[in-house]
Amino acid sequence: MEKLKEFLKGVRDELKRVVWPSRELVVKATISVIIFSLAIGVYLWILDLTFTKIISFILSLRGSL
């Protein structure tokens, strides 16, 4: 039980030393991550659509032989 108390005291002391980011910085970083994720998602969607069309075209050529 004593070790648990020491551990929790150490955790509390460490949390006091943490330099937390400002709200403004957190909001800006969050917006950046959302925009980047959306951009990557759109890029992958276009890539998937393109490959789907190419494969469908190739398979349609094979079917006409």
Curated annotation (Swiss-Prot):
Protein location: Cell inner membrane
Topological region Cytoplasmic: 1-27
Keyword Cell membrane: yes
Biological processes annotated in GO: intracellular protein transmembrane transport; protein secretion; protein targeting; protein transport by the Sec complex
Membrane topology: Single-pass membrane protein
Record-annotated membrane-spanning stretches: 28-59
Domain of life: Bacteria
Keywords: Cell inner membrane, Cell membrane, Membrane, Protein transport, Translocation, Transmembrane, Transmembrane helix, Transport
A GO CC annotation given for this chain: plasma membrane
Stretches in topological domain Periplasmic: 60-65
Main location: membrane
Gene Ontology molecular function terms on file: protein transmembrane transporter activity
Cleavable signal peptide: none
Keyword RNA-binding attributed: no
Subunit structure: Component of the Sec protein translocase complex. Heterotrimer consisting of SecY, SecE and SecG subunits. The heterotrimers can form oligomers, although 1 heterotrimer is thought to be able to translocate proteins. Interacts with SecDF, and other proteins may be involved. The channel interacts with SecA via subunit SecY.
Family to which the UniProt record says this protein belongs: Belongs to the SecE/SEC61-gamma family.
Physiological role: Essential subunit of the protein translocation channel SecYEG. Clamps together the 2 halves of SecY. May contact the channel plug during translocation.
Protein name (Swiss-Prot/TrEMBL): Protein translocase subunit SecE
